[in-house]
Design a protein with these regions (language model features):
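Conserved mid-domain beta->alpha element of the FAD-binding
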Residues: 25-29, 340-353
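Glycine-rich FAD pyrophosphate-binding loop
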Residues: 28-48
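Active-site lid/adjacent beta-loop-alpha segment flanking the redox-cofactor pocket in flavoenzymes
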Residues: 221, 236-348
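Dinucleotide-binding Rossmann-like beta1-alpha1 core, especially the glycine-rich loop
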Residues: 52-131, 252-255, 262-264, 285, ...
Length: 353
């Protein structure tokens, strides 16, 4: 039998994906012990369980670079600290350019990353081909290499942070739905759930795709929406352990070694015009669910992928995933206290991009 909900907590976190688990973990590291995380289903449900798990430090602002730089450091030590396997594999990454304009952009980002202490270097087309032997390179003009990038298993990483949070004194409750945010005099006072009310001083909205609806409970605007994201896993094709993840931003596609199917490639893409989903609300029971495959929508990515890695065509497709992630209008994270309500914080809009 699970423990009853407390009547009071200093901080309540809504959402048990990787973001909510991370907030709980880091609050305990800061000495906060009276922390309660509420998850409507099971930990890692929603987006975390199916996320692609790319870990990259390639960003176009100093602030974002500092965030992802810290993430790499955290992932590199989290498993040893918590004893919970995370799947983190620091293989490095390659990003290729098909045009001079793209290469100029990568050089600018390289300069920004170096100023933030990121180990990053331009490499020749030949060097890129040696690092990724199955990659077609005759249409490329250049590439960059980030040795300390990698990949991880998001669900396992979230579980490791949840364990670290509990070890640090936080309490985690699954199967608890938040039904309202209690307010008084312009500030948070507590939450209502399907299992009773909890008074608190601070609420952190880490609801992922549900963050907008959670915000609406208390008059806070959280500008994000869900869209379909698709990726596939090939049949085994001899991809060795330790191979770097690969990005082709001109074609908006990415590749990495699949961490579950030995020797296979995981490939996905981010279209400029994505398919919105859940515009009439995200179902509460959309926890470990997939959407109907839409091969016609994904086909352009497959064609680009086969152009970049021709051996994929003969290998064939083992699995095709279609699920939902949340996106913001400017593709930036939403982090901080809401201006509409004191002590109501939002950590949302983080996704596979």
């Amino acid at each position: 039998m699970s423990a009853p909900l407390p009547h009071h907590a200093q901080i309540i976190i809504i959402g048990g994906g990787i973001v909510g688990c991370s907030v709980a973990y880091h609050l305990t590291k800061l000495g906060r012990k009276d922390v309660v995380l509420l998850e409507q289903g099971e930990l890692t449900g929603g987006t975390t369980w199916h996320a692609a798990g790319l870990v990259t430090q390639l960003r176009n602002s100093h602030t974002l670079i500092e965030i992802v730089k810290y993430g790499v450091d955290l992932y590199s030590r989290l498993e040893a600290e918590t004893g919970q396997p995370t799947g983190f594999d620091q293989t490095g990454s390659i990003t290729v350019a098909r045009t001079e304009g793209r290469m100029d952009e990568l050089k600018k980002i390289t300069s920004l990353a170096r100023a933030s202490g990121i180990e990053i270097e331009p490499i020749t087309i030949r060097e890129a081909g040696e690092m990724w032997p199955l990659m077609r390179t005759d249409d490329l003009v250049g590439a960059i290499h980030i040795p300390k990038d990698g990949q991880t298993l998001p669900a396992e990483t979230a579980k490791a942070m949840a364990k670290g949070a509990k070890d640090g004194g936080a309490s985690i409750f699954e199967g608890v739905s938040v039904t309202g945010i209690r307010r008084s005099e312009g500030a948070v006072k507590g939450v209502s759930t399907d299992q009773g009310d909890i008074e608190c001083e601070v609420v952190v909205n880490c609801g992922g795709m549900w963050s907008r609806e959670i915000g609406l409970m208390c008059g806070v605007a959280v500008p994000l929406h869900a869209a379909e994201h698709m990726y596939l896993v090939t049949n085994p094709m001899g991809i060795p352990k330790g191979i770097r993840s690969l990005r082709d931003p001109d074609e908006q596609i990415y590749f990495r070694r699949d961490l579950e199917e030995e020797g296979a490639i995981l490939m996905g893409g981010f279209e400029s015009v994505a398919k919105p989903w859940g515009m009439n609300g995200i179902p509460d029971d959309y926890i470990f669910s997939l959407l109907e495959p839409d091969w016609e929508h994904f086909k352009v990515f497959w064609e680009s992928a086969v152009n970049r890695v021709p051996a994929m065509k003969d290998a064939g497709i083992n699995r095709f995933y279609v699920s939902a992630e949340s996106f913001t209008p400017d593709n930036r994270y939403i982090l901080g206290e809401a201006p509409e309500l004191k002590n109501f914080f939002v950590a949302a809009g983080l996704n596979s991009t």
